[in-house]
């Protein structure tokens, strides 16, 4: 455990979707962030593009890890873990994995975000855009069939 984390530190457990064995659980993945702030680079490297654009701590890998850690450790109520506010903290993460390659602790915020989103959408509506992308194969088959006739008629009439 990181020296910055108090001995009495305990986390709320929940059913994890991904395999976090190497990280010693989801909490362990968050605890990899030791607060050094390499994710706050602005002049070189790719990490973290959303922080580089906003210069706001909450949009750095460290800020996101701290927010999630606060929710699962009891510093914030656990329901904050799947709140709209937490969604906004993670929303600008591009899932580019620069944090995993450039962070000295190899924090994988993309994987952390995927776990968060899975839990978030258990209690929130999945956006239409996400549903459409998840079902793009069905949409493509429709557009190649019925809709292609309609599109051809429209194109020929112009």
Give the positions of each predicted feature.
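C-type cytochrome heme c attachment motif
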Residues: 32-35, 47-50, 92-102
């Amino acid at each position: 455990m990181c020296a910055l984390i108090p001995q009495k530190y305990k986390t709320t457990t929940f059913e994890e979707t991904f395999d976090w064995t190497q990280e010693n659980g989801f909490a362990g993945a968050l605890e990899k962030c030791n607060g050094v702030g390499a994710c706050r680079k602005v002049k070189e490297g790719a990490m973290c593009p959303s922080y580089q654009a906003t210069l706001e701590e909450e949009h750095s890998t460290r800020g996101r890890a701290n927010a999630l850690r606060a929710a699962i450790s009891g510093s914030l109520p656990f329901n904050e873990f799947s709140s709209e506010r937490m969604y906004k903290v993670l929303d600008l993460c591009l899932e580019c994995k620069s944090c995993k390659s450039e962070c000295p602790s190899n924090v994988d915020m993309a994987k952390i975000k995927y776990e968060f989103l899975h839990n978030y959408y258990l209690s929130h509506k999945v956006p239409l855009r996400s549903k459409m992308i998840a079902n793009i194969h069905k949409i493509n088959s429709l557009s190649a069939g019925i809709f292609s006739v309609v599109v051809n008629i429209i194109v020929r009439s112009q």
